[in-house]
Amino acid sequence: MFKYTDRSVRQYIERQQRSAMLEQEQAEKDKKERRKAGLLFFGTIVVLVAVVAVYIVPQSLDAMWHENYEKPAQEAARN
């Protein structure tokens, strides 16, 4: 049978502790990366909504205004 020594047991425990610490550090890094990716995704959505609200909506409203009110008024003024 294999005889365990205090040194081999101590080395085994140290290796287990080191690997547990490395796994915990990796889990924390992964959590931070997921949070960062989530914030980036949320920020992208916010920017897209802002572009629609600031640029596209006013232009479409202006086009509708021109089509529904200005154009008929100009045609009526010509006639």
Curated annotation (Swiss-Prot):
TM region positions: 37-57
Keywords: Antibiotic, Antimicrobial, Coiled coil, Host membrane, Membrane, Transmembrane, Transmembrane helix
Subcellular location: Host membrane
Primary location recorded for the protein, binned into one broad class: host cell
Membrane topology annotation: Single-pass membrane protein
Coiled coil spans: 15-35
Entry keyword Transmembrane helix: yes
GO CC aspect terms: host cell membrane; membrane
Loss of function: phenotype: Disrupts inhibition of host cell division. Has no effect on host DNA synthesis, burst size or latent period during infection.
GO biological process, one term: defense response to bacterium
Function: Inhibits host cell division leading to filamentation. Does not prevent host cell growth, DNA synthesis or chromosome segregation. Does not seem to be essential for productive bacterial host infection.
Name by which UniProt lists this protein: Inhibitor of host cell division protein
